């Protein structure tokens, strides 16, 4: 049961309305998470700006794989449903690739290095080793790319924490519990 309300269209603060309307138009419906997040125009619009900027980072398969890995570590079932859906339908990842990403890996070596690094960042709270940095650099990522990976980890963690705190009603397909994959 949700611990906050998902706003109805007439309840959305005026400063959140353009952002929420754009998401609704783009997605085709208003996810409960966004309808709740819109209660705070400052937080909602800041997150939306970060999301817009980070949608240009790396490639969609890598971004979605990182989202899956981070959401798995953070135990966010809402976000795992969202990222599993987008990974399948937008990034065109196979079911096996989605499970692998949730475990912090990928089939393609360069993407695997990014996902493993993101997994290390979230597990160690950023206290990665020199060897971790060397591995991701050796895979072909620049320091700018590594900063983007870190920003993606932070962005996905924000929505993980938001959804874990407020426990929104799921409006994306449920995923298999992590213990059984």
Label each region the model flagged:
Residues 1-181:
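Hydrophobic alpha-helical segments
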